[in-house]
Amino acid sequence: MENKGEKIAMNPTVQTLAQKGDKLAVKLVTRGWASLSTNQKRRAEMLAGYTPAILAFTPRRPRMTNPPPRTSRNSPGQAGKSMTMSKTELLSTVKGTTGVIPSFEDWVVSPRNVAVFPQLSLLATNFNKYRITALTVKYSPACSFETNGRVALGFNDDASDTPPTTKVGFYDLGKHVETAAQTAKDLVIPVDGKTRFIRDSASDDAKLVDFGRIVLSTYGFDKADTVVGELFIQYTIVLSDPTKTAKISQASNDKVSDGPTYVVPSVNGNELQLRVVAAGKWCIIVRGTVEGGFTKPTLIGPGISGDVDYESARPIAVCELVTQMEGQILKITKTSAEQPLQWVVYRM
């Protein structure tokens, strides 16, 4: 660098300017290159006609890989590896129970549980793991202020425990709230931030794959089975570790059911009932093995509607159904109790 400065100082143009009293030239000649500031050095180079070496710059190119994951728990997931879902879904319709003896209903919190997560359960078929970052159960009343009765919500973080059947057992739960039927109430469930595997089968260990169990209790109403409100589940869940899509249809050969639980079958003699676990649109196909093996299916419940196309010769029935609430039933009557049936349920 000193050689460069000496060359510029000995430049005839700089020497001439120094003799004429130019301050920059005088400073360079008398005090040296190191005494100049950066801007003064640039001006001196221009005066001496000095051309700096040409530097080659490699242009920056955009990365074509996944971005690093964000640390915020509510931030979007890493592209191609995880997905964050924040939503509020209808969990259940709350019905009143008369007397002081409460009735109980419960749901296991697992992303593929259609009864708890009607929409998320479909997305969860593409992932192996999940992490819950926020979870709240909301009770929304749909009754008058004169309605008697109590509604209680509880949560057990161990889904393998037996659901409570008494008030004492319910209030032993680690987290619970209670309210009058005409008053809204939220149950904010604490989360642990753990990443769990998504349940694949009923044989999986509930302690490892399920987040917990939500419990609803009602009692003290003047009338039974009257709608008093609705339950909603509000959540933020991160799905991770993409995998091949799991089964999205439920099929049965009359005894064994495979796939997600859209309906719960029950058999009583020659009668088969398929109870739908959630509100939604469904296509149910029922097929027998002999002509006239079953009669035309019927719809049971105040919240179910749809069309049933039935052909006795084959026999086969195609049912396109809409359920406004859980618990609605499609009833099939067989000509004999031993007559096998096959049925498949699709989500529409």
Curated annotation (Swiss-Prot):
GO terms for cellular component: T=3 icosahedral viral capsid. The keyword Protease does not apply. GO terms for molecular function: RNA binding; structural molecule activity. Binds Ca(2+). Ca(2+) probably promotes virus assembly and stabilize the virus particle. Residues 82-239 are annotated as: S domain, virion shell. Keywords: Calcium, Capsid protein, RNA-binding, T=3 icosahedral capsid protein, Virion. Residues 74-86 have a biased composition (Polar residues). It is found in: Virion. Residues 59-86 are annotated as: Disordered. Coiled coil: none annotated. Residues 240-348 are annotated as: P domain, projecting. Signal peptide: none annotated. InterPro entries: Capsid_prot_S-dom_vir, Coat_prot_C_Carmovir, Viral_coat. Gene3D superfamilies: 2.60.120.20, Carmovirus coat protein (2.60.40.1780). Its cofactor is Ca(2+). Homodimer. Homomultimer. Capsid protein self-assembles to form an icosahedral capsid with a T=3 symmetry, about 32-35 nm in diameter, and consisting of 180 capsid proteins. Also acts as a suppressor of RNA-mediated gene silencing, also known as post-transcriptional gene silencing (PTGS), a mechanism of plant viral defense that limits the accumulation of viral RNAs. Belongs to the icosahedral plant coat protein family. This is Capsid protein. It comes from Carnation mottle virus (CarMV).
